[in-house]
Amino acid sequence: MTSPTRRRTAKRRRRKLNKRGKLLFGLLAVMVCITIWNALHRNSEENEPSQETAAVSNTDQKKEVKKKTAKKSEEQIKTVDRNQKISNYLKEIGFSGTAMIVRNGEIVTNKGFGYADRKHYIQNNPLTSFYVGSSQKALIATAILQLEEKGKLQTSDPVSTYLPHFPNGQTITLKNLLTHTSGINGHIEGNGAITPDDLIKDIELQGIKRQPGVWDYKDSNYSVLAYIIAEVSGEPYEQYIKNHIFKPAGMTHAGFYKTYEKEPYPAVGYKMEGSKTVTPYIPDLSQLYGAGDIYMSAIDMYKFDQALIDGKLYSQKSYEKMFTPGSSSTYGMGFYVAPGSYSNHGVMPGFNILNSFSKSGQTIVILFSNIQNNAKLGQVNNKIYQLLNQE
C-alpha cells in the first residue's frame, strides 16, 4: 500500500508535468502562428505594386512577372535632374510623364513625373513607353526621303505612279502628302481593325475636297505614304522603319502598337474630365497606319532627333528639304518650322507629345505625357526654353 506522502508527491509531479506540457504546447502554437503570419505578410508585400517598377495594364496580370524580370540596365537607369527650376515648374503644373532635355550635348533633365499607372501607383521613369501619335509622321517623312536618296522614288512623283486609282492622283504629288497640301478628304477613323489595303481603298473612295496646294492636315496623307514605303521598299512598312530608322538611330525601346504591352514600362493613358482622371478608350491603331501606330520612350525620340541632326539617317540635302515649310502653316515634312526651332506634336486618347529642337541642334526638349489634356505642351516647351536661357 502506498503511503499518503508518496501519493502527494506523485500528484505534485503529475501537476508539474501537465503545466510543462501546456506551456510547451502554447509555445508551439505561438511559433506556428508567427510562421503563418510571416508567410502571409511576405506574400502581401510581394503583391503590392512598387512605385519604381514597370507600368502594368489594368487587365494584364502578366505585367507583375515582367516587373521582376526586367533587364538590370533598365532597372538601374538613373534619373538626371540638373535644373531645379525646370523640375519645380513641371511639378507645379502637374505634368505627368517623362521630360528629356539636352543642352549643348549635356543631359539637363531625364526624369519621370507623376504616375505611369495610377491604379497600381507605378511612377513614370526615363524609360516609360508612350504612344507618340502624329509625332511619328517625322519618321515616315524620313523614310520617304531615304528612299528618294536611294533612287526608289521622287517626292515630286505623282501619287498615281504608285496608286493608279488614287483620286486626282496624277496631280497630287508625294510632296503634297508630306506637307498636308494634297486636298484629299481622307479616311474617317473607326474603332475596329482594318488592313492597309482596305484603308487605302477607303481613302480613295472618299475622294478629294480641293485641288492640291492648300494646307489641310489629314492623317490619311501619311497613311498613303506608309503604304508607298511598303510598295517601293518591298518590305512591310513596319519592318522598314525598324531596319532603317530604329536600328541606325539606336531606338531600342521603340516599336509598333501590337507589342506595346510587352515593353517593360508601358504607360497607361489618362484624360481629365472635370476633377476626375479617366482612362479613355483607344481604337484599334491599325486605323492610324503610318500616322499614330508607333510608341517609344523619350530617350528614343531624343536619339531620333540627334540622328537627324548628325546626318545618320539621310543627307544634308534631305535635312533641308524636311525643314522647309510647304505652306503658310509652316509645316515642312513631319515638323513645324519656327524662327528658332523645329517641333512636332502628337495627341492621342490618353497621350500628349511634344518634340522640339533648336535650329542649331544644341537644345532638345522632349515632353511625353500620359495625360491627354492637363497641360498645353507648346506653352510648357516655350517656358522651358526661357528657363534654359536664364542659366
Curated annotation (Swiss-Prot):
Residues 44-76 are annotated as: Disordered. Induction: Up-regulated by sigma-X and sigma-W factors. SUPFAM superfamilies: beta-lactamase/transpeptidase-like. Belongs to the beta-lactamase family. Pfam families: Beta-lactamase (PF00144). It is a single-pass membrane protein. This is Putative penicillin-binding protein PbpX. Residues 50-59 have a biased composition (Polar residues). Keywords: Cell membrane, Membrane, Sporulation, Transmembrane, Transmembrane helix. It is found in: Cell membrane. Disruption phenotype: Cells lacking this gene display no visible phenotype during vegetative growth or sporulation. GO terms for cellular component: plasma membrane. It comes from the Bacteria. The chain crosses the membrane at residues 21-40. One of its GO terms (biological process) is sporulation resulting in formation of a cellular spore.
